[in-house]
Amino acid sequence: MPELPEVETTLRGLSPHLVGQRIHGVILRRPDLRWPIPEQIERLLPGATITNVRRRAKYLLIDTDAGGSVLLHLGMSGSLRVLPGDTLPRAHDHVDISLQSGRLLRFNDPRRFGCLLWQSGTQAHDLLAALGPEPLSDAFTGDYLHALAQGRRAAVKTFLMDQAVVVGVGNIYAAESLHRAGISPLREAGKVSLERYRRLADAVKDILAYAIQRGGTTLRDFISPDGAPGYFEQELFVYGREGEACKQCGRVLKHATIGQRATVWCGSCQR
C-alpha cells in the first residue's frame, strides 16, 4: 500500500498540472470502488476550477471552487497519472477528469480498495476527523509519543502505525524507523523510555523526508505520476528482508506477525 512518501510524491507530481485548471468533464467507468463514488463528483466538477492540491495523512484532496474537494485514497494498488487527453483507457482505468489544458487526470486501481469521495466546504470528512498529527510537523515529537504511550500494552510498532497517534506511518516506514532507533517492534509501547521515543520520532522524520526525496518506495503496485520508480526500496534495512543479514551487525533478521502485519527486525540491534 502506498504510504506517506508515495502519496507526497504523487502530490508533488500532480500539483503543477492541476492547480488553476478548469475541469471540462468527468468519466466514471467503474463507480463502485471501496465505496460508491458520490453523485457530486459528476454533477459539481464539470466547469469547476482546481484551486489547490494537498495531502492529509495518506489522502489527497483536490480543492475546487465548486464548494468542496475531491478526497482520494490510492488504496492497495491505485495510481494517478496526468495523460494526453486522447490516451485510450486500459484495464482498471476507472475515472477520468478532463482538464482545460487538453490533458486528463486518470485514476487506475486494479484491486478497487481506493476511494474517490466528496468533502463539502471546509468541514473535514469523517475519514479525516480522528487523525493524529503529521509526522513531519512540529507537533510530532518524542515527548508527544511518550506521553501518549503511557499505560499502553500494545506493541510499539502497532502503536506507531495507529493513525490516531500519527498519520501516514505504515508498515514499511514503521519497521525502518524502529530499526534506526534501535527499538524492538515487540516492546510494549508503554515501556519505551522518553529518550528512546525521542530517537524514534527523529528516525521517523529523517526516514520519511529522505524517502520523499528519493521518490518513495517502488513496491508491487505503486506508480508515481510520471511513471518513474521510487528508489528508497534499494536502501531498506529490514522491511521485506526476512532471513537476510542485518546490514549493521550481520546477524540474521527475525520475522513475526504483529497486529496482522508482517514484521522484520534485528534481534541484536533492536531491543
From Swiss-Prot:
Binding annotation for DNA: 92, 111, 152
Record's cofactor remark: Binds 1 zinc ion per subunit.
Entry annotation: catalytic residues: 2-3, 58, 261
Alphabetical list of InterPro entries matching this protein: DNA_glyclase/AP_lyase_DNA-bd, DNA_glyclase_Znf_dom_DNA_BS, Formamido-pyr_DNA_Glyclase, FPG_cat, MutM-like_N-ter, Ribosomal_uS13-like_H2TH, Znf_DNA_glyclase/AP_lyase, Znf_FPG/IleRS
Cofactor(s) in the UniProt record: Zn(2+)
SMART domains from the UniProt entry: Fapy_DNA_glyco, H2TH
Gene3D superfamilies reported in the protein's UniProt record: 1.10.8.50, MutM-like, N-terminal
Biological role: Involved in base excision repair of DNA damaged by oxidation or by mutagenic agents. Acts as a DNA glycosylase that recognizes and removes damaged bases. Has a preference for oxidized purines, such as 7,8-dihydro-8-oxoguanine (8-oxoG). Has AP (apurinic/apyrimidinic) lyase activity and introduces nicks in the DNA strand. Cleaves the DNA backbone by beta-delta elimination to generate a single-strand break at the site of the removed base with both 3'- and 5'-phosphates.
Subunit text: Monomer.
Name of the protein in its database record: Formamidopyrimidine-DNA glycosylase
Annotated organism of origin: Xanthomonas axonopodis pv. citri (strain 306)
